[in-house]
């Protein structure tokens, strides 16, 4: 199911290059969102997506409600583990919305201080993932994704027990009754509708959760193919900062051709794992190389507004931004 959905998205990207190039501003009054999660809607249509960072509470959320980005990466790995602030941030996004594309909010993906280092660690801390989802966030990025069994526990934490399709290798989900109230209000749907949509995409084609991994150290790198293959995962990155620390090499946020050969090899290995498992690859994009990155296979751009604007024009995006 996952491989089919993402393969179709890649075909869609090639087709967009043949479509007429209409300006985003001309469409903004007529475009009708097809999904809750703007980032998933774009990926499913074969379009790369671009993000910005976020933190704080209500006022910060309201300020970012009109962001240029497709999604906001809300920092909790090294920032405060403050679920009240996160809930207020989401409320601010709603009050400041909708987006230019007509979505109620930009998508919000939260990085966790919980790590994918072992099944036991993830199982003991699955409640952190659940508290994030209770805020109305649209996804989670799990750092140091070393152990496939930990990744399975991560996905379980983001599913209801009766979620479809069933995946025997995952086991049943861990979300419980009562978790649908606040997020359904943030999403602007009923609690019953939320429970149907609160599931990872593309495992569930109708799911609105976007789950990702940071394959960002030598231990995770050794298992890159295995962790990327876990059903329910939609994207991964190679974590050039932490990867450099793990390999005792310089930081890898520079252009690919400037990196140490061992860092280039690590990046290539994560990119290959993403392609093999039909999930999106996240990488830094710059105005001077965003088109090259897209051609290489990057589907999530970490960079500024200028790079995003150029990338959207390059792929002839139809959704307003």
Residue ranges and their predicted role:
Residues 7-16:
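Bacterial N-terminal signal peptides
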Residues 18, 22-321:
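Expand to "…catalyze enediolate/carbanion chemistry for C-C bond making/breaking, isomerization
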Residues 1-7:
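Bacterial N-terminal signal peptides that target proteins for export
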